[in-house]
Design a protein with these regions (language model features):
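Long extracytoplasmic/lumenal interhelical loops at the membrane interface
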Residues: 268-327
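Hydrophobic transmembrane helix bundles of membrane-integrated enzymes that assemble
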Residues: 2-32, 45-66, 71-263, 312-395
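Internal amphipathic alpha-helical repeat/solenoid segments
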Residues: 38-45
Length: 399
């Protein structure tokens, strides 16, 4: 038995198996955000959760036997599985939390750069197919008319902001994967793509956050430059130290803002209008539901796929309030700790771009609901993954 487990470890089979499972999981989830009509086999989701769960549990047993876990990793792995399982079991709509929990735990010691690579390849391939198919008339290109933004195209996805979110997360994943090897040409290409996507779909939050991310990349390059003022690198370090807790800071900020919101106050109304009535819609949902320890089924209207849905739209767009209301305040607390721990590990590994990306993602999730969605955010897998610290030459060699 001992020899078998050590051989699995020696040949890196655990990591290879994880990347195969991850690619399948991301593929299915990204396809579900497009207009491709796929009739999955009955109980396909449960089969997928069983595969991910079986892998994660077997790996945990093996790694405990080989003493590959630190105490905090093992304890927090059980906390994630336990807390995510409760709403997955007791609410009919959230069984996918099984898959998310086991994906996070199963990423133990898998190179995070390999995770990013798999995510980018699968997501980009699906998006390219969706865009081409929508323009060729093979699937629907949903169009939404906005009085301020004109016609917004979904480009084969279920909603324009979903298309924008995919591009945003791909851009962030790319700059983190490239790390210190990111070139000015790549920054220019990402900027151009972001502008084109904005013209086509007008995803304001995703476009703004992409440019903020690129600004941070430029800042990081200047901080590394020989002869750069000490204040530039010092400021980056201070921002990264604070930024490790970005998800918690933005979550607390949104919950406080929602608590103070008054729909009859003209100043709140003007501010809420600028953020697309997110506070008002959440306020309406809070009239019917309260925040619980482990969440509840919430009836929402606004999952995309329908250009006429705006007439009775009622959706939790913000990630933090969505998690608190749907999955429970306990899950939100676990998610906040999970992201803080992952960001801290990235900071300790000198992967400052990942820490800066975490800040931008936390800001993005202030407006969008993708914080713990496998189709969008691979950074939720950071906490237990292997985070390599690469110099410029080492990164170039790896690429």
């Amino acid at each position: 038995m001992d020899k078998i487990l050590k051989k699995l470890d020696y040949y890196n089979l655990w990591n290879k198996a994880y990347l195969i499972i991850l690619s399948l999981y991301v593929l299915i989830n990204v396809l579900d955000t497009t207009m491709f009509e796929i009739n999955w086999p009955e109980k396909m989701g449960y089969v997928l959760y069983a595969i991910v769960g079986g892998y994660a549990i077997a790996k945990m047993i093996c790694f405990v036997y080989l003493k590959r876990y630190r105490a905090w990793e093992l304890i927090f792995s059980f906390i994630i599985i336990g807390t995510f399982t409760i709403p997955a079991v007791f609410t009919t709509s959230y069984s996918y939390l099984f898959g998310i929990a086991f994906l996070i735990v199963g990423a133990k010691d898998v190179d995070f750069d390999d995770i990013l690579k798999v995510y980018m390849i699968v997501t980009a391939a699906v998006l390219i197919c969706a865009v081409v198919a929508s323009q060729a008339g093979l699937i629907v290109n949903l169009q939404y008319e906005d009085p301020n933004k004109g016609i917004r195209n979904s480009m084969g996805t279920i909603y324009p902001t979903d298309f924008g979110a995919h591009i945003f997360y791909l851009a962030v994943a790319w700059v983190c994967y490239r790390n210190k090897a990111l070139t000015w040409l790549e920054i220019g290409i990402i900027s151009a793509v972001t502008i084109v996507v904005y013209v086509i779909s007008a995803p304001v939050t995703s476009a703004a956050c992409t440019f903020i991310m690129l600004f941070m990349c430029i800042w990081d390059k200047l901080a590394d430059k020989t002869g750069s003022p000490m204040i530039v690198s010092k400021a980056e370090d201070i921002v990264c130290r604070i930024g490790q807790f970005a998800v918690g800071i933005f979550a607390a900020g949104y919950l406080l803002m929602q608590h103070l919101y008054d729909p009859l106050n003209i100043y709140w109304s003007e501010f809420d209008y600028k953020i697309s009535l997110r506070l008002y819609y959440t306020y309406q949902i809070l009239e019917k539901y309260s925040i619980r320890l482990f969440g509840q089924d919430i009836e929402e209207k606004g999952f995309g796929r329908d250009p006429d849905m705006t007439h009775d739209y009622l959706f939790l767009d913000d990630s933090y309030m969505a998690i608190a209301l749907k999955y429970g305040i306990v899950i939100l607390a676990v998610v906040i700790i999970m992201f803080a721990a992952g960001q801290h590990r990235a900071y300790r590994s000198n992967r400052l771009i990942i820490v800066l990306a975490g800040i931008v993602i936390a800001l993005h999730c202030f407006m969008e609901h993708h914080l713990i969605e496998a189709a969008y955010n691979p950074f939720m897998l950071l906490i237990f993954a292997k985070i390599g610290a690469y110099t410029y030459k080492e990164r170039k060699h790896k690429l």
